[in-house]
C-alpha cells in the first residue's frame, strides 16, 4: 500500500506542478537537496531518523495506522518527513501530502478541479495523526441500477454482465485510501458476480490496503446470496444441513486465509432474512451459539490459533437483535456491530457492561435503503444533520472499533 500511495502522490504532483517527482531509494537518508523523506517504523534507517527528529517511537506504534508528518529544518535544510507507524499509516501520511498540495480525495469521482501551481510554500510544522475508529469503510449495496450498469456499460466495457472487476474496484479503493478508509463490504446482490469470483479483485484490495469484509447475511467471507446457488449443496440450513454449510464456509476461509479479512460471524438466511430450520427465539439462540463456536474453531484451525489476532464481527441486525437480547452469549473478543433502524436512527448502543468487551463495538449505518416498508435512494439519502447526531452518539458510546 505504501508503493500505491507513492504512485498516487506522484500522479498528484504532476497534476499540480506539471513535473515529475524523482523517487530515490537510498541508504543515505538525508542529502543537501530538497527532499520528501518517507519511511515506516521497523524499516531500516527508520529508527535513526526517528531519533534524529526527536520523536517518541511509541507515539507512532501505540496506535495502528498512525503517521508523523512534518516540514522541518534538519542540518540547515528544510525537508518534509512522512513516517508511518505501519504501512497503512505511511500511506495515509502520503495522502495527506496530496491534500496539502490542494488535491481533493474526490478528484476523480467528483471531478474536483486541481489548481495548478508553480511553487509550493509550506511553513514549518509537525503533527502526529491516528484514526479515531479502527476500521472505517463502506458497503456497496443496492448496486443493481447504479454501480453495476455504470461499470458494465461505461467505465469497464467488455466485462461479463454483472461483473465488478479490478478496474472498477481500483477506483473505489483509491477513493477509500485517499479518505483514510480501510474497509469495504463488496457488492453482493444477485445481479452481481461475487467479489471473490472475479480474478484480480482480491489482489486489488491488498494493493490499496483494504480489509475486505461482508454484510450481516454473509458469514465467513462468503456472498451467500450469490454463491450458495453455485457452490452450495441442499438448503442453506444449519439445523438440517450443517455439514454442507460448514464445507461452503471452509472453502472460502482456506482461499483467503492469508488475505486481510474482517470475518462476519453468525448466520441469517440466504439474503437478508431469518435463518432456516429454527423457528422460535430460543431455537435460533441455540443454533447461533453452535454456529459461533464452529466458525471460530474453523478460523483457529485455518487462519490463526490465536483468535484475538483475527478481526471478527457479529452484527445484531433486524431479528438478530432480538436473539441477542434474549441472552445470546457472544465471545468477548468479537466486535459487536450495532445497527440503525434502516432510517438513520440507531437501535442500540452498548451499555456499561457491554463497553467492557475486549472486541469493542462498531456501527452499521444506512445512508440509503432499499427494502420494506419504504425505500429511500439516490438524492433522498439520510439527512447529514441526522447522520452527524447519530454517529457522534455512537462514537461517544465507544463504538470505535
Question: PLM ranges: what are they?
Answer:
Residues 13, 86, 138, 180, ...:
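Conserved, mostly hydrophobic/aromatic
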Residues 1-130:
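Contiguous, structured surface segment used for ligand recognition
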Residues 81-84, 141-166, 182-192, 227-245, ...:
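The substrate-binding groove and active-site-proximal loops of carbohydrate-active enzymes
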Residues 106-161, 167-187, 359-362:
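An acidic-aromatic substrate-binding cleft motif
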Residues 161-189, 200, 204-213, 258, ...:
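Catalytic domains of carbohydrate-active enzymes, especially glycoside hydrolases
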Residues 23-25, 114-121, 189, 196-197, ...:
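Gly/Pro-rich turn-and-neighbor structural signature
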Residues 42-43, 74-113, 195-222, 226-255:
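Hydrophobic or amphipathic alpha-helical targeting/insertion segments
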Amino acid at each position: 500500500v505504501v508503493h500505491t500511495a507513492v504512485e498516487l502522490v506522484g500522479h498528484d504532483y504532476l497534476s499540480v506542478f506539471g513535473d515529475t517527482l524523482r523517487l530515490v531509494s537510498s541508504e543515505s537518508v538525508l542529502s543537501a537537496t530538497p527532499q520528501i523523506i518517507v519511511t515506516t517504523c521497523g524499516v531500516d534507517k527508520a529508527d535513526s531518523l526517528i531519533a534524529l527528529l526527536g520523536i517518541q517511537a511509541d507515539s507512532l506504534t501505540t496506535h495502528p495506522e498512525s503517521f508523523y508528518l512534518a516540514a522541518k529544518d534538519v542540518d540547515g535544510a528544510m525537508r518534509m518527513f512522512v513516517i508511518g507507524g505501519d504501512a497503512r499509516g505511511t500511506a495515509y501520511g502520503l495522502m495527506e501530502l496530496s491534500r496539502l498540495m490542494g488535491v481533493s480525495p474526490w478528484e476523480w469521482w467528483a471531478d474536483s478541479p486541481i489548481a495548478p501551481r508553480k511553487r509550493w510554500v509550506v511553513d514549518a510544522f509537525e503533527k502526529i495523526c491516528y484514526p479515531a475508529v479502527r476500521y472505517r469503510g463502506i458497503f456497496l449495496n443496492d448496486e443493481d441500477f447504479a454501480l453495476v450498469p455504470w461499470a458494465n456499460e461505461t467505465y469497464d466495457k467488455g466485462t461479463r454482465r454483472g461483473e465488478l472487476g479490478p478496474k472498477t474496484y481500483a477506483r473505489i479503493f483509491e477513493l477509500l485510501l485517499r479518505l483514510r478508509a480501510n474497509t469495504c463490504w463488496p457488492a453482493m446482490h444477485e445481479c452481481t458476480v461475487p467479489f471473490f469470483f472475479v480474478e484480480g479483485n482480491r489482489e486489488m484490495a491488498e494493493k490499496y490496503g483494504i480489509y475486505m469484509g461482508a454484510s450481516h447475511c454473509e458469514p465467513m467471507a462468503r456472498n451467500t446470496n450469490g454463491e450458495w446457488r453455485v457452490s452450495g449443496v441442499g438448503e442453506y440450513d444449519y439445523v438440517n444441513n450443517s455439514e454442507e454449510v460448514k464445507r461452503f464456509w471452509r472453502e472460502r476461509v482456506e482461499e483467503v486465509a492469508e488475505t486481510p479479512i474482517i470475518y462476519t460471524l453468525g448466520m441469517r438466511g440466504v439474503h437478508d432474512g431469518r435463518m432456516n430450520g429454527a423457528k422460535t427465539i430460543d431455537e435460533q439462540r441455540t443454533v447461533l451459539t453452535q454456529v459461533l463456536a464452529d466458525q471460530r474453531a474453523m478460523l483457529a484451525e485455518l487462519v490463526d490459533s490465536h483468535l484475538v489476532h483475527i478481526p471478527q464481527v457479529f452484527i445484531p441486525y433486524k431479528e438478530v437483535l432480538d436473539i441477542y437480547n434474549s441472552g445470546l452469549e457472544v465471545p468477548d473478543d468479537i466486535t459487536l456491530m450495532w445497527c440503525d433502524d434502516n432510517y438513520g436512527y440507531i437501535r442500540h448502543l452498548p451499555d456499561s457492561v457491554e463497553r467492557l468487551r475486549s472486541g469493542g463495538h462498531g456501527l452499521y449505518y444506512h445512508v440509503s435503503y432499499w427494502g420494506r416498508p419504504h425505500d429511500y435512494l439516490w438524492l433522498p439519502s439520510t439527512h447529514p444533520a441526522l447522520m452527524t447526531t447519530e454517529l457522534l452518539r455512537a462514537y461517544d458510546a465507544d463504538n470505535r472499533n
